[in-house]
């Protein structure tokens, strides 16, 4: 006799345990199970704020480790090519391909879940923006390492998702809302890193920052910490992007982190 399928509550609890143990692949499995169970419910039930945040944290950690690995390996590859070490460079390219296959598998997994369950079941504006931003993020991660037509397609999909999220955010979320600010942060990073459009990146980031600062006095205590943190990241990127040409470019561009608690971005 096969064991009973775990309940939604059991899967959420196991995901929390996996997070504490830093076993993020298992955390992804548990939260995918929750998302599919909710999406398969009558009418497609929406995830709770806690559940969607757990899903985001799980995937952000799984993808984040591979993105960091890819950057390190790509840097080593460039150095070996510069030294003329063709044999080493070929070995590194093969190893980079393995990491890229893992990145693609992870991105394809969450993008399929977003399209089949999460975006269609999202009712509130906040949820729609959250998931569309997430969709844009994972298409952007594909664009980071793809080339040619695949990169172009990933960039177009990123733009479409971020633009759809932005349209809803501008209409329905306050300028100080952490999810709206996180969207602006990541959208501006997309302009800068993927589209090589520093002017558009700076304009988007500055507008989001200025609009939020003008309404900061009306911000509730609950969101104040979250919002001001992302505003600081927007400012950090603006400083980096507008710094003089003598800068060594060693500073890291900031993105919106996965939420740690309900409401965080």
Curated annotation (Swiss-Prot):
Signal peptide: none annotated. Residues 244-265 are annotated as: Disordered. Pfam families: 14-3-3. GO terms for cellular component: cytoplasm. Residues 251-265 have a biased composition (Basic and acidic residues). GO terms for biological process: protein localization; signal transduction. Is associated with a DNA binding complex that binds to the G box, a well-characterized cis-acting DNA regulatory element found in plant genes. PANTHER family: 14-3-3 PROTEIN (PTHR18860). Interacts with BZR1. Interacts with ABI5. Belongs to the 14-3-3 family. This is 14-3-3-like protein GF14-D.
